Swiss-Prot record:
Predicted to be exported by the Tat system. The position of the signal peptide cleavage has not been experimentally proven. Its main location: periplasm. PANTHER family: TRIMETHYLAMINE-N-OXIDE REDUCTASE, TRIMETHYLAMINE-N-OXIDE REDUCTASE 1. The gene is torA. Reduces trimethylamine-N-oxide (TMAO) into trimethylamine; an anaerobic reaction coupled to energy-yielding reactions. Binds 1 molybdenum-bis(molybdopterin guanine dinucleotide) (Mo-bis-MGD) cofactor per subunit. It comes from the Bacteria. It holds the Pfam family Molybdopterin. It is found in: Periplasm. The lineage of its organism: Bacteria, Pseudomonadati, Pseudomonadota, Gammaproteobacteria, Enterobacterales. This is Trimethylamine-N-oxide reductase. GO terms for molecular function: electron transfer activity; molybdenum ion binding; molybdopterin cofactor binding; trimethylamine-N-oxide reductase (cytochrome c) activity. Belongs to the prokaryotic molybdopterin-containing oxidoreductase family. Disulfide bonds: none annotated. Mo-bis(molybdopterin guanine dinucleotide) binds at residue 191.
Amino acid sequence: MKNKDSLHVSRRRFLAQLGGLTVAGMLGPSLLTPRSARAADAVAPGAATKEGILTGSHWGAIRATVVDGRFVAAKPFEQDKYPSKMIAGLPDHVHNAARIRYPMVRVDWMRKGHQSDTSQRGDNRFVRVSWDEALDLFYQELERVQKTYGPSALLTASGWQSTGMFHNASGMLARAIALHGNSVSTGGDYSTGAAQVILPRVVGSMEVYEQQTSWPLVLQNSKTIVLWGSDMVKNQQANWWCPDHDVYQYYEQLKEKVASGAISVISIDPVVTSTHDYLGRDKVKHIAINPQTDVPLQLALAHTLYSEKLYDKNFLDNYCVGFDQFLPYLLGEKDGQPKDAAWAEKLCGIDADTIRALARQMAGDRTQIIAGWCVQRMQHGEQWSWMVVVLAAMLGQIGLPGGGFGFGWHYNGAGTPGRKGIILSGFSGSTTVPPVHDSTDYKGYSSTIPIARFMDAILEPGKIINWNGKSVKLPPLKMCVFAGTNPFHRHQQINRIIEGWRKLETVIAIDNQWTSTCRFADIVLPATTQFERNDLDQFGNHSNRGIIAMKQVVSPQFEARNDFDIFRDLCRRFNREAAFTEGLDEMGWLKRIWQEGSQQGKGRGIHLPTFEVFWNQQEYIEFDHPQMFVRHQAFREDPDLEPLGTPSGLIEIYSKTIADMQYDDCQGHPMWFEKIERSHGGPGSQRWPLHLQSVHPDFRLHSQLCESETLRQQYAVGGKEPVFINPQDASARGIRNGDIVRVFNARGQVLAGAVVSDRYAPGVARIHEGAWYDPDKGGDLNALCKYGNPNVLTLDTGTSQLAQATSAHTTLVEIEKYTGPMDNVTAFNGPAEMVAQCEYVPASQGNPHD
């Protein structure tokens, strides 16, 4: 009981001293200094400048320069010929005012524990504690929740985290928590939630994260490329593993082909994208579709292909099932409305003749459909994904070089020929060691829920929802643990999140920046960035170009610790340290990962040097023999020997499996469903006339690097996140370029800086996702976000009962020039640290139950 007693003594001493302090009295003199001015306190003077330190990141490999112990510059790795502009912000990722410096506990939670006033979450008042105390509190809460409620009350989540095969927060969080007890797991993700559920039903695989046809073959064989909601040039800057950016050489070649007229590119998008602009504003045919009406356009294209006998009947007969069940809907035999070009014109805002001409062009020669992810991130996003496949099937070019469809062209260097190399392993989230609390009694609740519906579980526990053919009873969550993720960035409708957060008893966040998730947490633990540790990573994703050493650039800042060390010490508190570490430290794990890769290589005729030679001398190795690849070629060449993973083994234009689910919002074949809200004459557009896009940003990866002042200086407008708006819409509202505006709807309000641009169609506005939430009244529902997080405005509803994915792009807003008080942006300043000197008795290093 020594550990437990120490914890109680510590809290009593804290409370005794806290009671006599005012807020002003709790602020120590040094803490009155702005955090930005105190950032240098973390840097110990060094003896020399270090240059050329090789490491990697989501934005590419770099050579780092360190002066006096401080990461001051990032230069592109010499093997990256197309480096991202975002690497300029990487030093800020380490040294900025929003770094989490110490373990912190929310003031009222420190007073009352899990019985705290949860409406105070977000008030940004925290107490600094020692690592021992923070981990004791973490462990105590895990124990309490498992003993009081069981596994149905605990949810853990991770996300994009940092690069590195070993230091992955998701695996470490999963292993540590699983060694203590079971918990609620999640399925799906926020990027491709609708597509990744529907496509396995239609073509037998997820498609969204898979390799695409090699670009050299596309450039050689395609005559028409249709970019449908895909912005490759912008989005390929950042990848899951360290990108090599080789794919940009093919964009250069595509630009040359477009300029010469050898390839025609058509962009179906409400916006002139970065890719469209790069290939040539006047060279790319722009079909500026009304938002959320892509399915009517697809149906009209299919109708034209069928009615004008431009479709490939042989392909439909031999490689597909269900076209005959789909056809009556397409022709209007079911509902009296043919889904022809004249019908679609009224919804899409695209001339019927243009629609018919597009269908003829696509059928006229080899056509590659390049589909992005943004379109499926709206209500009924499954239908658009399904129709992409149907159109490609009707064209009959699936499995041919430069033809067919693909959903991952903008991600992970897709289309770059893959090399014959090895893929390193990493730190697994599972072990064979049983947990301390081995209960699998979820008390009738589901043990797995769709990630995009986790707020429903918090707000409506016990509610039964459908999900991909299953019935899910949402569990009554009481505690959440987040590592390497930021739900306040990735989840929709922030005021609904805040409402749900008030129902949780304990929230723990492990991160390196004071994101909104951390500000709304009870216990915050400071993790290192990838630049403060050693690791290994792939160089190139689909290209599998090589392996790179991620060398430590600077020492861990302040009291930040590696996730590995955080969870190791947590596991020590319940006698699972050995199971967590497997007896290895950081370098021990890197050697094991390397040795496993070496064994893998031997089976492929690849010889790797010893780890010591690689780490100390080479730092980078490159694989040979790029392999050309055609997506779905094997299936086309022999559908009997190479069937798809569908029940029929063929492309399912009609799915009996889905039809048997009897969902009214996702039936047996693709259909057009009206949205809850839609611009350009759709539901809700009279009150909220502007469609809001919240697509991937150009200067960060989701919310990562929003803390970089270096990068914000390149895009922020008046210190706010920019909102892009069409000149007609701006003029009608008296808005000029550079004005601070209020963007609002019934769900919330944000401030943003206006950028007036004709790249955006009338009725369409954009705020990039990942902007940090900055409420003027922290923790209050309906606060004004002073910086411009679009998820204050987005709608939290499932795409359908099939995928239950995010519908972020089903969002309408209004915009007006802002004339109210202009408070300073404080999102990037870190917390208001409440200082009370309290003695803490260190926890026992042995078994806390001794």
